[in-house]
């Protein structure tokens, strides 16, 4: 796919060397060993995102999961993967179900917006194929969340977004604000604060009405605001005005503090030679 606002293409274009190859066995093995070394009873979450992680092929994931199972002691392991949904077929769905993966699928809500923002490499529409993958995952009992990029175009139509949520019986959805590129040049997709607040105010009214009718939809921002109101720590990164601790490992082994800052100047190490403790910020 060739998403028109692709953040990862922007990041890669600002690095000295674009990281476009599939992760090798040496890097995958190092990630597993470093993570399991944190503690014998730790809860470890492996989350895969891209680009598009399914381009690595199903054999890559079979191998990764098998290695974790061989090497772990008493650690609890959870799995997640963010995908554009384009390649999801029966074998993928069965694999995700078998290993309890939480799958996030990128869908920009209603059909015409999605197809204009998220075409394939030839410029053709992808909505029908992606939603077919979403339905297959559900039918196979895989936990699915929807992720939508909140562009200025989407922000103008909260009613259409909520109609999509109801029509497709979406139970969990989150919206990622579309920000200007790293050169800080505003484009036609990026969001301004006024559009952001207007969208969420109207969306809240629609969500609240649905809740009053006994139908609950998990909208990530609303849940995090409620968590904070109850004195709990939010799960959404940045809600407290600072970054949550995490490590992002690129396919070449480079370690970064966040996928938004996977740039040369923020590279903190190489997973093949540095321990996680040594790289803790």
What are these regions (language model features)?
Residues 1-2, 52, 243:
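Cysteine-centered iron-sulfur cluster-binding motifs in ferredoxin-type domains/subunits
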Residues 28-47, 56-178:
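Radical SAM/AdoMet-radical enzyme domain recognition
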Residues 1-24:
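Canonical Radical SAM [4Fe-4S] cluster-binding loop centered on the CxxxCxxC motif
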Residues 260-281:
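Flexible mid-to-C-terminal extensions adjoining Fe-S/redox cofactors in radical SAM and related proteins
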Residues 116-128, 135, 139-242, 248, ...:
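Radical SAM enzyme [4Fe-4S]-AdoMet core and its adjacent flexible, acidic
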Residues 11-15, 112, 180-183:
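A short, flexible beta-alpha/helix-coil linker loop
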């Amino acid at each position: 796919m060739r998403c028109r606002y692709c953040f990862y293409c922007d990041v890669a274009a600002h690095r000295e060397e674009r990281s476009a190859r599939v992760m090798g066995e040496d890097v995958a093995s190092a990630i597993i060993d470093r993570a399991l070394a944190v503690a014998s009873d730790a809860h470890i979450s492996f989350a895969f995102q891209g680009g598009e992680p399914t381009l690595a092929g199903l054999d890559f994931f079979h191998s990764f999961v098998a290695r974790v199972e061989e090497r772990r002691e008493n650690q609890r392991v959870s799995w997640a993967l963010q995908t554009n949904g384009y390649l999801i077929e029966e074998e993928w769905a069965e694999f995700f179900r078998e290993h309890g993966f939480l799958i996030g699928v990128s869908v920009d809500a209603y059909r015409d917006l999605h197809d204009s923002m998220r075409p394939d490499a030839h410029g053709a529409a992808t909505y029908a194929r992606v939603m077919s993958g979403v339905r297959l995952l559900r039918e196979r009992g895989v936990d699915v969340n929807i992720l939508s990029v909140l562009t200025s175009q989407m922000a103008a139509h909260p009613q259409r977004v909520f109609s999509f949520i109801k029509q497709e019986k979406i139970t969990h959805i989150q919206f990622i604000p579309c920000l200007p590129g790293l050169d800080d040049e505003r484009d036609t997709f990026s969001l301004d604060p006024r559009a952001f607040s207007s969208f969420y105010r109207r969306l809240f009214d629609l969500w609240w009405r649905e809740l009053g009718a006994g139908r609950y939809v998990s909208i990530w921002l609303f849940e995090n605001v409620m968590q904070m109101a109850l004195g709990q720590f939010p799960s959404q990164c940045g809600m407290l005005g600072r970054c949550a601790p995490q490590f992002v490992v690129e396919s070449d082994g480079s370690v970064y503090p966040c996928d938004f800052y996977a740039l040369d100047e923020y590279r903190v190490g190489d997973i093949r030679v540095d321990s996680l403790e040594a790289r803790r910020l």
